[in-house]
Regions:
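Short catalytic helix/loop segments, enriched in acidic residues and glycine
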Residues: 20-44
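Conserved anion-binding
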Residues: 10, 16-25, 98-169
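Catalytic domains of carbohydrate-active enzymes, especially glycoside hydrolases
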Residues: 41-57, 100, 169
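Active-site loop-to-helix "anion-binding N-cap" substructures in soluble metabolic enzymes
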Residues: 43-47, 73-74, 80-84, 88-117
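Glycine-rich, positively charged N-terminal anion/phosphate-binding segment
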Residues: 35-47, 64-72
Length: 169
């Protein structure tokens, strides 16, 4: 078994939130834990302990007043460990994270429009960052007997069913 470390940043703080409680309105979330340390502290700790394959997730929406502070923390943490980074990733800002030391960028919301994958947007990201440095997050929620991809900080269900056909695309 491998341990994959994660750093979630919300409202400028590293924290663990209660799953599904994140709301864009008012930048709210129920919290399990809020750290006194910043993202760079945890990135250095993970590197010191040789933990690989981790990621940093910016939990505020791109248009949140907290996004810029969250982004600064993520960028400061990246040189310490070559982590993956996700949250508000677009073709316009993906290079900033990769140039700062991210091993990959993680994307979901940008490539989904009106409940479906927008393959033009996905191809644009592939063109900008390269297929080998792009992670398409297909986080999902069970609805009946199916698992549907969920986007926008786990707030919006899509029409995309997670199955073999989707994963092969």
């Amino acid at each position: 078994m491998e341990f994959r470390p994660c750093i979630d940043i919300h409202n400028g703080k590293v924290k663990q939130i209660v799953g599904g409680s994140l709301k864009d309105s008012g930048d709210q979330a129920q919290e399990n834990f809020v750290s006194e340390q910043d993202a760079a502290f945890y990135a250095a700790l993970y590197q010191k302990n040789k933990l690989k394959g981790g990621h940093i997730i910016l939990l505020n929406s791109y248009d949140s007043p907290y996004y810029e502070e969250t982004q600064k923390q993520a960028l400061a943490a990246l040189p310490a460990g070559g982590l993956q980074v996700g949250g508000g990733i677009t073709p316009e800002n993906a290079g900033d994270y990769l140039n700062a030391g991210a091993s990959h960028v993680i994307v979901t919301s940008y490539v989904f429009r009106e409940g479906r994958i927008d393959y033009d947007r996905l191809e644009r990201l592939v063109y900008v960052v390269g297929r080998e440095r792009l992670v398409l997050d297909v986080s999902c929620k069970r609805v009946g007997e199916k698992y549907l991809v969920v986007t926008d900080r786990w707030q919006k269900l899509t029409e995309e069913i997670v199955n073999e056909s989707l994963l092969e695309k």
